[in-house]
């Protein structure tokens, strides 16, 4: 998928050619993208916001991609050498540079990868980067023998609600279609998949990477990627899908497309969650990795979470100091997690 990202980057992105083929891109970044919703609304309600809001959009160099869970780094480079090289190459020519999605003690990575990430964060701090908590990555360890056992770990009220929603499964036809299947040679089907993806993108609170139709076409026609598409149809009409990939013994849930309002009427989010868990279990996988968005509903469904860190280098020294002081306001998922912990301890 990295090659597909490079060949067909999201709208408004330009791929960067970096040392040792480290993936990266440049894009206009809205500084309010990850700000807590209530604060964002207050800022947007300020006088003349539409006139001065352009100053909140900054041309930024990103190290990483939007199609991988974690940043990808060349094994041949030490963390310190890589960070120095990147800062010298990009730090002077962009107002802002972000090394995105650096793992923090991730249960999804081995000890070697986690140690490298620790050294990378230390090197970033030494080079003047501001460290900002990233989004919450949802995952479920496949440490149960049946979906019923998994549901048994949830509260009785949640079990009852999920089982009630699951009854809609009887009205659906569900197919597992590997990427590269002959059906994806039909341009009309690619168009339909892309339209359903845009439905989800348009109703999302965060708008950053709008994938292109060309990217979807290459992804769905790639037989060698390990991709599996879960199609949901009602009376032969496509009302939703998940595009997942099997990688390193894990089922990675990457993209979802939904037809509204049918997807809500048939509880597709809940049904697809259990379908994906069952697939991971039946194929002997170790984890289901469920992505970055909608942490509240994924928590309700029983997910655990691991956080990443973004290392931000601001070219202007004064603004760099301000970024360090106000960085906590850009950590909306961490704020959500901190609010969630007391509730969990109280048993709610």
Where are these regions (language model features)?
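N-acyltransferase acceptor-side catalytic subdomain
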Residues: 1-348
């Amino acid at each position: 998928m990295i090659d597909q990202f490079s060949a067909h980057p999201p709208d408004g992105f330009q791929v960067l050619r970096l040392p040792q083929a480290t993936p990266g891109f440049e894009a206009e970044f809205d500084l309010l993208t990850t700000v807590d919703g209530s604060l964002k609304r207050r800022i947007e309600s300020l006088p003349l916001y539409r006139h001065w809001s352009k100053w909140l959009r900054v041309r930024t160099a990103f190290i990483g991609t939007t199609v991988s869970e974690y940043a990808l780094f060349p094994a041949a480079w030490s963390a310190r050498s890589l960070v120095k090289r990147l800062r010298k190459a990009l730090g002077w020519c962009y107002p802002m540079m972000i090394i995105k999605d650096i793992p923090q003690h991730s249960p999804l990575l081995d000890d070697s990868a986690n140690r490298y990430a620790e050294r990378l964060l230390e090197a970033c701090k030494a080079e003047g980067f501001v460290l900002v908590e990233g989004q919450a990555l949802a995952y479920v360890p496949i440490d149960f023998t049946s979906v019923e056992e998994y549901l048994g770990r949830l509260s009785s009220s949640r079990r009852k609600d999920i089982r009630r929603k699951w009854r809609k499964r009887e009205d659906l036809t569900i197919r597992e279609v590997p990427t590269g299947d002959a059906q994806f040679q039909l341009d009309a089907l690619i168009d339909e998949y892309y339209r359903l993806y845009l439905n989800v993108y348009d109703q999302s609170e965060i708008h950053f990477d709008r994938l292109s139709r060309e990217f979807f076409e290459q992804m769905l026609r790639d037989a060698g990627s390990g991709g599996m598409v879960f199609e949901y149809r009602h009376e032969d009409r496509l009302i939703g899908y998940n595009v997942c990939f099997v990688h390193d013994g894990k089922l990675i849930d990457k993209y979802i497309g939904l037809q509204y309002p049918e997807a809500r009427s048939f509880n597709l989010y809940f049904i697809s969650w259990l379908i994906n868990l069952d697939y991971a279990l039946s194929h002997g996988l170790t984890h289901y990795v469920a992505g970055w968005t909608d942490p509240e509903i994924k928590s309700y469904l029983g997910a655990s979470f691991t956080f990443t860190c973004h290392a931000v280098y601001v070219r202007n020294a004064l603004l760099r100091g301000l970024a360090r002081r106000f960085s906590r306001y850009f950590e909306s998922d961490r704020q959500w997690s901190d609010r969630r912990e007391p509730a969990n301890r109280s048993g709610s």
